[in-house]
Amino acid sequence: MSGIKRTIKETDPDYEDVSVALPNKRHKAIESSARDAAVQKIETIIKEQFALEMKNKEHEIDVIDQRLIEARRMMDKLRACIVANYYASAGLLKVSEGLKTFDPMAFNHPAIKKFLESPSRSSSPTNQRSETPSANHSESDSLSQHNDFLSDKDNNSNVDVEERPPSTGEQRPSRKAGRDTSSISGSHKRELRNADLTGDETSRLFVKKTIVVGNVSKYIPPDKREENDQSTHKWMVYVRGSRREPSINHFVKKVWFFLHPSYKPNDLVEVREPPFHLTRRGWGEFPVRVQVHFKDSQNKRIDIIHNLKLDRTYTGLQTLGAETVVDVELHRHSLGEDSVYPQSSESDVCDAPPPTLTLPAAVKASAVAQSPEPAAAAPVGEGFPETTEAERHSTFYSLPSSLERTPTKVTTAQKVTFSSHGNSAFQPIASSCKIVPQSQVPNPESPGKSFQPITMSCKIVSGSPISTPSPSPLPRTPTSTPVHLKQGTASSGVSNPHVIVDKPGQVIGASTPSTGSPTSKLPVASQASQGTGSPIPKIHGSSFLTSTVKQEESLFASMPPLCPIGSHPKVQSPKAVTGGLGAFTKVIIKQEPGEAPHVSTTGAASQSAFPQYVTVKGGHMIAVSPQKQVISAGEGTTQSPKIAPSKVVGVPVGSALPSTVKQAVAISSGQILVAKASSSVTKAVGPKQVVTQGVAKAIVSGGGGTIVAQPVQTLTKTQVTAAGPQKSGSQGSVMATLQLPATNLANLANLPPGTKLYLTTNSKNPSGKGKLLLIPQGAILRATNNANLQSGSAAAGGSGSSGAGGGSGGGGGSGAGGTPSTSGPGGGPQHLTYTSYILKQTPQGTFLVGQPSPQTPGKQLTTASVVQGTLGVSSSSAQGQQTLKVISGQKTTLFTQAATAGQASLLKLPDNTLKSVPAAPQLAKPGTTMLRVAGGVITAAPSPAVAFSANGAVHQSEGSTPVSSSVGSIIKTPGQPQVCVSQATMATCKGPAAVAGTAASLVSAPSSISGKATVSGLLKVHSAQSSPQQAVLTIPSQLKPLSINTSGGVQTVLMPVNKVVQSFSTSKLPTTVLPISVPNQAAPSSAPVAIAKVKTEPETPGPNCISQENQVAVKTEESSELSNYVIKVDHLETIQQLLTAVVKKIPLITAKGDDASCFSAKSLEQYYGWNIGKRRAAEWQRAMTVRKVLQEILEKNPRFHHLTPLKTKHIAHWCRCHGYTPPDPESLRHDGDSIEDVLTQIDSEPECLSSFSTADDLCRKLEDLQQFQKREPENEEEVDILSLSEPLKTNIKKEQEEKQEEMRFYLPPTPGSGFVGDITQKIGITLQPVALHRNMYASVVEDMILKATEQLVSDILRQALAVGYQTASPNRIPKEITVSNIHQAICNIPFLDFLTNKHMGRLNEDQ
């Protein structure tokens, strides 16, 4: 029978043989069972193999799918390039053929041509596009063309577009652009011809020229406006030629714009350089008087009144306002050069007048720049005009002609740059595109350029309004852009099409704008920039490269349009753009000083305007290529992650970020994520969690659940994982778990807005080590009731707001398992549930995974797998404003302080020994409790009884609920204070509302947990107590916090309390301690073995165990200073004194284990042994610690409230100047003084050099004087003798007493204190030894005097060093401290005035 029983399928195959081994059973049964077992084994093996194969095949399919998508994307790009190339080259060839096809007009007889092509033609919508095959021109099209034309001044043919009325439907702009470009060459020639022809036909003397004045505008949403500038729109007025001959720079000298009086004193603006654009911000429409001045003085200046039309659709996209078309008759001879101008005639021949060409080129560039404003395309052109054109040429036309143009072209681009520059004076969009022309020289006009920067509206380029194309859904591409983005593609995400030119000649990636959304309109400007007609465009790549100042810059400029103009001022980073195109190489944005930082980070930045969605499939993130963003429509989220080429951003599927929130997440590899959110917090919908994958740091500051973007760039990958308990094994090793009881979450959420929560993880995983996670407070824990979106993952950048509690502590975050934990605003949390976060390390990076724990009592988390280090943060009170501070020193300490702390009690427990602590009653005082954990146990119980049992079973002192003895588990007893310390180092402080902490890393369920998981060093302290208390966990130094050592060290959780302390809000609940988990080396054993022993690092036992054996005495510390630092501030007044006191407590180099912190070196040699990076890091960490301690002191002591806290940088500098940071050995090595050093030295030396000499001569003189002056009567000497005899008697008495009493032991004085005793005796003061202990005496007073003297001299010398630093040349260390430095130092320190003659009296005679 037993054999049969043994065949149960679920049995572990390893033990299957047991059935075979049973003796005395029927052999048949045994054989059959063995056979069954074998069959079963085979079956399972086969099944496993098949499953494995299936998995592999699925994976292969996924990979293939991914590659197909990639290939498809590449094909799309290729097709766009081919099409553009085709049209471009076709245009060139046709030009040479005589532009027949190029221009529909070419078929018309010259006699009727003039009527067909009259300038007004461009203004009529029908004809507008006459040159282009398609009849419908969309506004965007026109815009793009406009850009085109802007970019290619010479593309006259296409330029007319501007005149075209906008029609949103057009999707072809890009194609047209391409075409235009190509046509440029042809059209230019034609244009020249036409210009001449038309002139001839009209009259011998005059030529008719069409001038178009138009404007584009863009609505600035209220959230994008600057505080001091509430303009509703950004607009650009442009002056250009007709579509046939867009560039007017060969006959127009300058343009004056007369603006509305409200623009005074700048209501008259002169633009001298070719892109005749003016960009401004404003809130109303008004007639603009545009005065055009011609180069030939015979042509009188003309005034054109143009009514400015602003975007009434309020879409935030750039829209074409209105255009005013004017025909002007100019003296033919004044334009004689015109025909020559290659620009106007595309003919390559024109190259001959290179200078002029250059000019046109410049114009083109500027035009391009301009165009951007009008159209999305423009941005491209503008930013890239050179690049693009050049690119285009090289890429698209691979004709020699393009080469010819090169020189000019370059110029153009440069010019453009300038102009955009010029605009920078205004906030125009372009702000970032400062393309510095490298050699503008070629343009004849270049001199004007200098002026240009001021007026030019080029600026727009980068931000250019065009980037926001008018509502037309199509993206506009500059007309000239040869690259056709796929306009048709409507990708839900808008991709910003930026084309960045990697290599001079090629356009790297144009992202496709998606037609569907208006944003998508951004055209790829780069192409546009190529002027169609202008010879310049022809540059071929290489030359263009050289000429361009910086390719990147130009690219960059063009990119900006992507972003809505003002949209991203903050992100401006030189980093590689994470923007839509993975392709970009580097884009560097330069911001002009005056400009608003509109430019978003390199092109990508501006994405935020358009939401990008990423779909998340299954828990995987699908990488979204910028071009096709997949959006899951359901999400309201507007997160627009910037995606770096390879990065993926996952938006939690279920979570809908409220659309209001626009998070711009920049992703790039190791950076920080910054999300800029509008006030709304993202809500998680459904049980999804957002996990950040590769977050190195996420910093969120500012509470309210909003994540504030800081300039930092960060990148995070967010991954969505299902909320269910995560198997720790699944994704890679778990680095650390963060457990947050829901209520605590709420508590954390209550911290005042500025609070920052840092989690640092340390684990064996090298990759996991030392990651600092800053958990945005807002995100911190607003868990929605039924969704466990842990905002803890906030690190990831999502901030979850709890739907229920939204308020500060009001609703506790919901616990795991989806059960809402209810806590009334006033009351303590009724259920504490923990959500634990696990820091997981996966190939993609480390991230926090939220682990909900089921709420129902009795359930156990099965995932009791071991976590290497768990960081638990729990703050119990739903609304306490407690501040949690954890600082890691050499012993990392976890410190929470309640706002109203009474006194702090310090409990020291010896290493692994658990002692019942008699002191418990003291602990009960609502004071701050300081727990020092030496070996691995910490316990603090605010409540009266504390029981430790060595075996880990918890005895409840109050006895209300039995605690199961399994090691890791604790039962939560509501209201019972209980502390259980299992060897697994876990302690919970429980207050009236008890929180159960369990050692088991993952097992944290309020209910009793039977699973014993081993935690490798988890210290948790939860205090749910309503009385405020402070608990400090000190984790032994062995675990080195922050340091990256491979052996897991303790990570510290820093929650700066500073801000927190101030809000003493309603709740009284104390904050709970953050559990710090110490990741120790114990390998996480996934088996739920109850390993209670925590392995600590080898060095662990050392320092901590020393005196802690019996010191159960509870020390009360006066200040709840950060962890170990106890600083007495009664006698301190100034910030300098405070700083000195704090810095002395936090040394950078210390041999003593107690003072050592994670960043301190044991000796100067060790410190100098570090490389400069580590030294700087230690210096900075020390400064940060000092700043935190200092801030806490300032906040806690009302008398310091008037002092302003210092920044970390200032503290680091101060420490360096005052000698608290050893100077870098590198800087000490400079033996040869540089001339500036010598000069500085000469300047700073006093007139009379003081040379140092020994005191011998002086002493001799003084002795001689004494001899000479010894004239006093000798009876005084007798008196002296008398006085000496009396003390002798007293001494005798003492000796007798001693004989009567027990033996007394005197500790021998140190040489220093012996010296002090001698000196004091000489002046008639005897210092009595002080009883340290019964019959133990030591010379304490002498030691104290010695120490005080040391401090005094140290203060003087350090101040003198600081004075020396001021006089030394910058970044140099003073070689020596001179007498004058010391004198200055003494004068600088107020309490040293007894050393100066400041308050000395004078005899009247002297007066």
From Swiss-Prot:
Domain (YEATS) ranges: 201-346
Positions with biased composition (Low complexity): 511-520
Record-listed cross-link Glycyl lysine isopeptide (Lys-Gly) (interchain with G-Cter in SUMO2), residues: 9, 113, 189, 486, 550, 590, 647, 771, 908, 1095, 1115, 1207, 1270
Biological process, per Gene Ontology: negative regulation of transcription by RNA polymerase II; regulation of cell cycle; regulation of cell division; regulation of DNA-templated transcription; regulation of embryonic development; regulation of transcription by RNA polymerase II
Protein name per UniProt: YEATS domain-containing protein 2
Keywords: Coiled coil, Isopeptide bond, Nucleus, Phosphoprotein, Ubl conjugation
GO molecular function: histone binding; histone reader activity; modification-dependent protein binding; TBP-class protein binding; transcription corepressor activity
Positions bearing Phosphoserine: 118, 120, 157, 446, 462, 464, 470, 472, 534, 573, 625
Gene: Yeats2
CDD domains the record matches: YEATS_YEATS2_like
Residue ranges, annotated region (Histone H3K27cr binding): 260-262, 283-285
Assigned GO CC terms: ATAC complex; mitotic spindle; nucleus
